[in-house]
Structures are given as structure tokens and as C-alpha cells.
Amino acid sequence: MDAFKGYIASQKIQHSHAPSNDSSINSGHEMHPYGVNRNINAAPADDYYTPYLGLRARLSQTWINRWTVLLLLIIVRLLISLAGIKGDVASAKTEALSACSSVENVGSAMASMPHYLSQGVNSMAAAGITKAVNGMMQMLYMSLTGVEEIVLFVIHMMTSTYMCLITLAITGSLQVAIQMIEDVGAFMNKSIDTITGDMSSGLKSFEDDLNGFLSKINIGGIFGSSTSPPTIDLSSEINKLNSIQIDPTTMDADLAKLNASLPTFEQVQNFTDNIIKLPFEEVKKLVNESMIAYKFDDSVFPVPQKKSLTFCSDNTAIQDFFVGLVKTLDTAKKIILIVLVIAAILACIPMAFREIWGWRVMQIQAALLKSRSYTNEMDILYQAHRPYTSQFGLKLSRRFKGQKNQILARWFIAYATSIPALFVLALGLAGLFTCLCQFIVLKTLEKEIPALTAEVGDFAEHVVKALNNASESWALGANSVINNTNTEINDNVFGWVNTTTGAINETLNVFTDEMTKALNVTFGGTILYKPIMGVFECLVGLKIAGIEKGLTWVSDNAHVEFPEFQPDVFSLGAAASLSNTTADDNFLANPATSTTDEITNAVVKVGKKLEAVIRQEALISTALVAIYFVIVLIGLVHVIIGMCGRDKSRGEGGSAPTPLYRNTDVEAPNQHLPEISREKFGTSGNDGWHQEHMRAGGDPITRMPFGGGDGAADDLPYNGAPAPTYEASIAPTERLGVVPAGRVNTNRGPWVRDEKSRELWEADDMQRRATSSYGHLEGGDEKSSGWGVPPRRI
């Protein structure tokens, strides 16, 4: 802003001062009082038209500065890229609509899958039921035969066991009793025979003796009777006594009769066998007939109707998505273009100030060339041509000690900021910035993709909903058929089982009753009845009760129940795919793609294409930036080698030492005191700005030239150009010390003493101003009291 204000002030002063030409070595330049600046853009009066561009001409071209041009190139690249993106979006829209129609067809086919699958499922279910029923009947037939034989075996085993026990117990007991009775009878008969024989002998003898006695005694004669006495005849009684016999057969007749009447239970077994076999045989006959004739009819299962989905035809979500996507891209394009255009316009403002400042610097350097107060013409031209990088190099070089290191530091900055190097860097940065803008557009595009994915998810939900409805309807009808089949089998097949088990239980009850009846007939009224009934209950009754209990359990559990179909039998996989984390399992996805589905893939391909372009341009731009850093690295290596290497002497082929200032006696006699010296010391030696600042009683702090000091800078006119400003500060009474040539002392500047003559002071002052590009301060004892001249930075 100071430079711009100085330029405006110079325009005003231009009209208040008439131009005057000097015929001296400074011909063509005006002399102005201290502090007055000419219009630095005005050409000399005798050279109004110049072959070079003035400030106004330079300012007229600020709108085509490098940064504005780069931003315009970026705008053009973005316009081309966005035009390509819009074309890709249009193609993606067409592809997405086509894919949506395809997905709609796929969804209709998926929703119609129950129609096609149900026929096969119905046939498979019917075949399964037929095989299951036939297998169950065959198993039932074999089970009936096995149960029949087992029941008969158990009954035979129980009756035979019971028969054997009864025969063993009762027959054995009766035979023992009969044998004992017969033995007792024989013993008694023998004893009676002996007793009766003895008695009959004794009676016979008594009879004979008695009759003899009576015959010898004539009792009638005694009593006057002629009757002979009677005789005693006991033979008949003796015979009767001898005939006494005990018949054992009459004693064990009842036991023999009981022994002969023991039951063999053959009738019971035959009766039971006939009763038990009858239901079994009837059931087996029915099972055989059913096995041959049974076949489940699959036509009783329902068949769902075909479905036709129209979620794309009746829905404008995809159209709305792409319209919104184009609007979003247009909005992003407008925002980016507005920002870039504003940045391109605003870039002209600092470039205008840059031209003003560069023009002033060029005027200063031109003044130095005019006065020939320089030692390095190339350095002066470089500073005039590249004022910014040269000034940056000057500031950087002050951090190094030694004239060679400072020159190498400036050379490194000049090498790194050369026009070709900066051109490569600018291209790389512009490319990266373009990639950034395109990346913003890409993220905007990717941000909209979830909305389309949600719409596609709704499409899938439509398909799954249709599948669920068809599957549930079919499952209800199929389950009704299965339930009817269960009822029919339970009533017709297992009804026979229930009848059979009931008949067997009834038969066992009849068997028990017949056994009890036979035992009552045989042992009723005898002492063996209760033991026999106890044995019967132990051996037969408990086992029959167990068989009846088992048959009752069979009757209670003899039923079949085929599993029913789940309502989501046809939609389970499709519904599960919606919640699956892997995209390849989505039933709407193409197996050859890795995106969620074909519809979103149409938009994703646009993003991938733009991403590939951004990646390619980013690699190219990064390569350009890398090339620039390679250039910088080459310069840095050269500088490091130069700083670390030893300087060659003149005898070794090195360069001659550079003088501190020009030999004015040889090269330019009587020309070492240009206009600037008169401005510095005045025409009489005591009215210049140097004397003004060096007089005692001046300002407590004096501002030194070349800008950047503690306060406002003094102006030093150079043939109409604005003067540089002071940087360091010293008091007017301080004396400057002498600094040996070639020494570097930080960044304060070279200080010289008043041992030199005035002409040497003037020439040295101009020399150091001309060689100010060295950017270092020479000297050791920089400040001392006494009179001195203003310091100069080189």
C-alpha cells in the first residue's frame, strides 16, 4: 500500500514540477528536492515513447497474470470434467432404468417362483407322504404280527407254567395222599385178619369146649327133662369177623376223582388263541389292502398364481434421483466456479501491487545502471528481473557467514525459483487443486448414492413382500391338506390299532375270567382254592395287567402328525439376503459385480470413472511437483558441495578477488559522484541529507536505508525513483568502526569510519549500494562514538 500511495503521490507531483534536463552524465533525469518523487512511470521528455512497458501498460495486463490464468485453466478443466460427468450421469440414468426394468422382470420371476416351485414341492410332498404311509403300514403289519405272536407266546407261557405248577403241586399231593390211604388200608386189613383169625380160633375152641361140656352134663336129666342141651355155634360170627376188610379205593376215591379231573387249560388256550388272532388277522388284512391301494394325490395341494411386479413402472424414484443428482452437480459446479472466478479476479489485486513494486525496484536498478555504481551487472539485472525471489534470497543469505556462503544461498533461491522450475511447480499445484475440486464433486456424487440404494432396497422389499404373500397363501392351503391327511390316517389306520388293542385287552380279560372259572370248578370248596388263586394272580394276573397297560399306552399314542410347511418356505432365502452383509448374496445383485445391485452399479461406475481420472491427474500433478523438488534437491546438493568445498586460489585456477568498489580513477574518472552524492552531501557539502542526519541535535534515532526499520523510512530519490528505506538504527553521535574486508558479521551492514576522504566515502557508498545483492554485513566493531556516515547494507 505504501508503494501504491507513493505512486499516486508521484502522479500529483508530476503536474506541479516542470521537467528539467541536465547535460551531465545524468542527462535525461530531473533534479528534485529531497523527499519529492517524480512520476516513475513517466518517460523522459525526449523519450516519451519507449520500447519497454511502463507501469500503466504493466497494470493493463494484470488480469492475465499467471495465477488468474491458472485459475481460468482450472475452471476450463472443471467445466470439461463436469460436462463429462453429466454425460456419464445421463448414460447411468439410461442404464439404471434399463437395469430397473431387468430387476423388475427378475422380481416378477422371483415373486412367481412359488407358482413354479409349488408344483415340484407338491409332488415331492405327496411322494413323501405316500412313502411314509406305505412304510408305516408295512411296519404296522409286521408290528401286528409280532405283537400277535408275542401275546400268544406270553399267554401260552403263562398257561403252561401255571399248568405245570398245578400238576406238580396238586397231582403230586393227591398221589401221595392216595398212596398213604392205600398203605393204611392194607395195614389195617392185615391187622384185622390177624386179630379176627386169633379171635375165631379162640371162639372155636371155646365153642367146642363149651359144647363138650354141656353134652357131658345132662342138665335136662338133672332137671327131669329128656331134652338135650343146646350147642353153641359161633362160626357165622367168626366168619363175619374174619371177613372184615378195609378197601382203600373207597377211601381215596374222591382224591382219585380229583386227580383225574385236573384241568390241562387246552380249552382255555384254544379259546384265547382264537379270540386274539381274530382282530390281528383282520387288521393285517386291512393293512395289506391299504398298502396296495394307497397313493397320495398331489393335486389336492394348492398352486399359487403368477405375480407381475411394477415397482419400476409405477415409481418415479429413479427419475427423481437422477434429476436431483444433476441439480446437485450443477449446484456444486456453480459454487466451485463462483469461488474460482472470484479468486481469479481477486488475484489481479495483489498482482497489480506486485507490478507497482516491481516497477519501482526496476527504476531503482535502472538508476544504479545509469550511475554505473555497481560491480556485478548480472546481479543488478537479476534483481530487476526477479525482484521477489532476489529479495528473498537476500534475506535468506543474511543467516550465513562468509561471502561465498551467502552467494551460494542466493544462488540456491534463484535456482529453485527459476521460471522453468516455478512453471513446473505451478502446473503440478494447479493439477492437484483441480483434482481437489473434482474430488469434492466425487464426494458429492457418492453422498447421493445411499438414496438410490435405499430405493433399490425398497424394490427388494416389494419382491420379498410378494414372495411372502404367495408363500404364506400356499403354506396355508398345503397345511390344510396335510392336516386332513393326518386325520384320515389316524382314523383309518391307527383306528384299527386302537380297535386291536381294545380287543386284545378284552381278550385278556376274558382269558382271566376263563382261568378263574376253571379254577373255581376244579378247586372250589377245597383247601387248595386260595393257594391256587394266589399262584394264579402271581404268575398270570400281574403279567396280563402289564400287557394291558402297554396296549393301553399304544392305543393312546398311536397317531401320526406330518410336519406342516412354514409360511416363509419360498421367501426365507430372499428375506435373509436383504439383511446379509455381503453384496454378492443379495438376490438382486449380478454375481459378476461387487456392487449392491445393477441399478446402483450404474451410478457407482460414474464415480469409479471420475475416481480413475482424478487418480491419473493426481499422479501426473504429483510427478510434476516431484520433478520440482528433484530440481530443488539438485540445487541443494550443489550448494552443499560448494559450501563444504575449499575455494581455489588464483594460482589453482580460481577467480580473482572481487574489489569492494570500482576503481573510479581508471574506469570512470570524475564520474564517481553522481546525482545521488549531491543529494547526500549537498552542493556545498553541508546541506545534503547526510549532513542533516549526522548533525548533532538531530533525531535521537536515525532510520537507515533499504526498508524494514523501526519506524517510517526516509526517501532517497534516485533520478525520479523512490528511494530505499533504512533498516538498522544508530544514534547520530555514534561512531562507526572499521570492518576488515571480507568479514561477515550477522546482518547489520558494513560500517566505515571517517579515515577515508570524502571522495572515497562517496564512491564506497555507491559501490556498496550497487552490490547490495550480497545480502550480508561486513565488519567487526560495528558501532563507536564519533562522526560517521549512514550505514549501507550490501
Swiss-Prot record:
Any one Gene Ontology BP term: plasma membrane fusion involved in cytogamy
Compositional bias of kind Basic and acidic residues: 756-768
GO cellular component, one term: mating projection tip
InterPro entries per the UniProt record, alphabetical: PRM1
Glycoprotein found in the keyword field: yes
Stated family: Belongs to the PRM1 family.
Protein name listed in UniProt: Plasma membrane fusion protein prm1
